[in-house]
Amino acid sequence: MNEYGGRMIDRMKPLGLAALLALLAVGGVRVIYPTASQDIALQPLVLDVDNPALRRVGGLVFEGAWELRSRNEDFGGISALVALADGRFIGVGDAGTLIGFGLTQDERTDRPFIAPLPDSHGPNQNYKDRDSEGIAHDPMSGQFWISFEANHAIRRYSSGFARTTGILRLKQMQEWPDNKGAECIIRLRDGRFIIIAETLDGDTHPALLFSGDPVERGSAVSAFRYRPPAGYRVTDGAQLPDGRLVILNRRISFPKGFAAKIALVDTATVKSGNIAAGKVIASLAPPYLVDNMEGIAITQKTGATYIWLISDNNFSIFQRTILMQFQFPPDPKTKKPEALAAPGFDVL
């Protein structure tokens, strides 16, 4: 098998690979490379190998995809993603690892790094202290918040992850099942926070809405529920520039393997006692490129909005860390009309 097993995976039949991934999704075969390399390599991918020119996926436009690779033993398992103002991304791994990178125009990584999450690898700490699943960021203060699904906690970190500045272990969160806790954390631009649990009660996820920083005692908390598309579970979420939420939902099934759906949620429906449900705008399933999609982030450039997805490879040789970029076109109904020429200037 060649480097990283990439070509071996490309040669496998899509259906057979999907079935294998479904079986190995929970406990993959971890690949250990004995190196602390900070390098992250990119390999461009297409959305559909049988139709490389395909770009339209539901309401989104495919812009590009890349497989991320590194020989660092801690690289992988990315379960959430956030975009920074300087153009880079930070992903958080479910083994307590921070993975940062940007993309250059020649499809190389910009200032990559792989580092342990502070205060998660001490002698008195175990996997539950490292099972980080969600990440949120305040671009003004530089602070980060990370959710942990096993010990049902939210930790706040100072700018640059220099130190831990607070921790929340809310009673309502402690009632969530082990390893099915805070899967998704979203910071809204008005300062409120949303936390959605991985566990499903019937067809909805329990969720919490905080009036402010969840770590601060003055923040009021209210409960609501999120209904994912049938057969799917929430993995991550972010807020669009227009204020709506974009929620990433994933399905693992045999023999079909992985699938993902992106849903839009009206933020006004996120309120105490309510069930918030989204409208699916795009679906990914074989033969389209898809893996264990767990992270989502939003960027803007020259007025265009982009949705980024990233997959959790479960440290398995049978899966990949895939980064995908889609443009989210503006709704024609809300697009501002073009200005008309003034009288006498329409011929210019």
Please provide the spans of the model-predicted regions.
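Sequence/structural signature of beta-propeller domains
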Residues: 2-339, 346-348
